[in-house]
């Protein structure tokens, strides 16, 4: 009919990250459920994968996590406490732990047992189903109530040791220094 079509949606760049070494965008941005004018992005721009808070115009407001460790996964959001639940290896490279990070960048560990933790967050963000293992302990599943100042943990399952009754090797984890004596 001769009427020019107007696009229903317009697109524009929200944020652009460049590096002369390497950029690998692996994780989508996540808008805060309690404030749709802000989003969280994971980036390795400081050498480690960390969380950054941005406004809706793409302006960086704050680096929420920092240090010589890696945010491995953004598990979800606790809307009541306005915090982000993450899995990270902050304490030790072999221990994947669960943390709550508030908008000031303050972190609180949500469980106290060493191991590799994998968690699912409830829709309300108040409960975690935390499944973890260690080389010497079979699978454990806990329900963690993170709505309190100190998380409350209830055991849901502790698997029987499938190797009970067998002679087992001794498991040890350690570090070996490189030629520079540091790493």
Predicted regions mapped to residue ranges:
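A short loop-to-beta-strand structural motif that recurs across blades of beta-propeller domains
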Residues: 50-52, 97-99, 140-142
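Non-catalytic accessory segments flanking enzyme active sites
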Residues: 1, 9-20, 24-28, 72-76, ...
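Short, flexible loop/turn elements at secondary-structure junctions
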Residues: 18, 43, 58, 68, ...
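Polyanionic (Asp/Glu-rich) segments that form extended negatively charged tracts
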Residues: 13, 50-66
């Amino acid at each position: 009919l001769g009427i020019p079509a107007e696009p229903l949606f317009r697109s524009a760049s929200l944020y652009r990250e460049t590096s002369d070494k390497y950029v690998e965008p692996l994780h989508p941005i996540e808008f805060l459920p309690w404030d749709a004018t802000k989003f969280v992005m994971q980036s390795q721009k400081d050498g480690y994968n960390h969380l950054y808070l941005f406004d809706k115009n793409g302006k960086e407001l704050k680096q929420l996590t920092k240090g010589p460790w890696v945010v491995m996964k953004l598990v979800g959001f606790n809307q009541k406490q306005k915090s982000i639940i993450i899995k990270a290896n902050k304490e030790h490279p072999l221990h994947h732990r669960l943390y709550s990070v508030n908008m000031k960048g303050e972190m609180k560990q949500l469980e106290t047992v060493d191991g590799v933790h994998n968690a699912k967050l409830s829709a309300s963000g108040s409960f975690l189903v935390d499944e973890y293992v260690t080389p010497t302990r079979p699978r454990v599943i806990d329900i963690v109530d993170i709505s309190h100042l100190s998380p409350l943990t209830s055991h849901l399952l502790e698997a029987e040791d499938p190797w009970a009754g067998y002679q087992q090797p001794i498991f040890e984890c350690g570090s070996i220094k490189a030629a520079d004596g540091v790493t």
